[in-house]
């Protein structure tokens, strides 16, 4: 969030979702996440399903929070899909390559999907803002 602090955001970024290069209704959004080990988004959910497939590296996909938290680790070409409303996050957990980015393919259903961070994710954002201001 912070920009406007809206609880609902586009998974593709505010600017990208507002001005698409090709204005069509394809029914899905496809993108890549590139990051180093230990990095990934905070826990969130979407109003549509979301599918992940690692291209390189090892990625941990988590769902639910607290005592209900579960996860699975995926390697290249493994696939996992989360239903609408299920809290989820992913993180690069590749070992021995701390300075190397890895790639995760992300497919989000729908023409205008929305994302919502969980309450615990917002607590982490507030903690970060407090310690970095």
Where would I find each of the regions flagged by the language model?
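Histidine-centered metal-chelating micro-motifs
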Residues: 39-42, 60, 78-80, 84-90
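Short histidine-centered beta-strand/loop micro-motifs
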Residues: 19-23, 41-46, 63, 71-73, ...
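Double-stranded beta-helix
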Residues: 87-133
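A short, N-terminal "cap"/entry segment at the start of jelly-roll beta-barrel domains
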Residues: 1-27, 133
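Short beta-strand segments in beta-sandwich/barrel cores
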Residues: 31, 40-42, 50, 57-63
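Short acidic-glycine-tyrosine-enriched beta hairpin
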Residues: 25, 49, 53, 65-84
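Conserved short histidine dyad/triad with adjacent acidic residue
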Residues: 10-18, 29-46, 84
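Conserved hydrophobic/aromatic beta-strand scaffold that supports enzyme active sites
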Residues: 30-34, 51, 71, 79-81, ...
């Amino acid at each position: 969030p912070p920009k406007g602090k809206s609880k609902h955001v586009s998974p593709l970024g505010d600017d990208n979702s507002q001005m698409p290069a090709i204005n069509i209704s394809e029914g899905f959004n496809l993108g890549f996440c590139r990051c180093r080990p230990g990095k990934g988004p905070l826990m969130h959910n979407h109003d549509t399903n979301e599918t992940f497939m690692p291209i390189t590296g090892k990625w941990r996909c988590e769902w639910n929070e607290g005592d209900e938290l579960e996860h699975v680790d995926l390697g290249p070409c493994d696939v996992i899909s989360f239903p609408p409303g299920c809290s989820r996050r992913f993180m690069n957990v590749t070992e021995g390559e701390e300075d190397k980015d890895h790639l995760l393919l992300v497919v989000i259903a729908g023409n205008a999907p929305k994302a919502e961070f969980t309450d615990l994710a917002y607590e982490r954002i507030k903690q970060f803002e407090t310690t970095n201001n």
